[in-house]
């Protein structure tokens, strides 16, 4: 949760705390916050221990699907398609279909067809079946 909290962010939080709470109340607020976090951590570890005792070996069986869900959580739709439907081959999505195989020389793309001749001015063609 706080893994991306850098020293710069901590410094900004301390400065904001000094401005908002003042130097008299800031140490008490820090103490209260650290105690609340410690109590929450103790509560969560107690719940985990109790679940482990109640479920026994089934607890490990429960962890396997949860870890798979955690892996899927950060996947983008493109990564999910690539992994599950395309077996990791994303050439369908990137458009890199024709890669040279075994060092074969790549052929240059064909020259584009000349543009069609513009329509001659005059009466617009009429199609009785189309109307």
From Swiss-Prot:
It is found in: Cell membrane. InterPro entries: TatA/B/E, TatB. The chain crosses the membrane at residues 2-22. GO terms for biological process: protein transport by the Tat complex. It comes from the Bacteria. Belongs to the TatB family. Part of the twin-arginine translocation (Tat) system that transports large folded proteins containing a characteristic twin-arginine motif in their signal peptide across membranes. Together with TatC, TatB is part of a receptor directly interacting with Tat signal peptides. TatB may form an oligomeric binding site that transiently accommodates folded Tat precursor proteins before their translocation. It is a single-pass membrane protein. It comes from Mycobacterium avium (strain 104). Residues 96-131 are annotated as: Disordered. This is Sec-independent protein translocase protein TatB. GO terms for molecular function: protein transmembrane transporter activity. The Tat system comprises two distinct complexes: a TatABC complex, containing multiple copies of TatA, TatB and TatC subunits, and a separate TatA complex, containing only TatA subunits. Substrates initially bind to the TatABC complex, which probably triggers association of the separate TatA complex to form the active translocon. Keywords: Cell membrane, Membrane, Protein transport, Translocation, Transmembrane, Transmembrane helix, Transport. Pfam families: TatA_B_E. GO terms for cellular component: TAT protein transport complex. Its main location: membrane. Residues 107-116 have a biased composition (Pro residues).
């Amino acid at each position: 949760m706080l893994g991306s909290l850098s020293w710069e962010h901590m410094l900004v939080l301390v400065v904001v705390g000094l401005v908002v709470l003042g130097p008299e109340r800031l140490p008490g607020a820090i103490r209260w916050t650290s105690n609340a976090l410690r109590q929450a951590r103790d509560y969560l570890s107690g719940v985990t221990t109790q679940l482990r005792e109640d479920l026994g070996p089934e607890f490990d069986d429960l962890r396997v699907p949860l870890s798979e869900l955690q892996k899927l959580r950060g996947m983008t739709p493109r990564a999910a398609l690539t992994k599950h439907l395309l077996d990791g081959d994303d050439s369908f999505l990137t458009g890199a279909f024709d890669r040279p195989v075994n060092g074969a020389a790549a052929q240059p793309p064909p020259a584009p067809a000349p543009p069609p001749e513009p329509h001659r001015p005059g009466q617009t063609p009429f199609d009785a079946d189309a109307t």
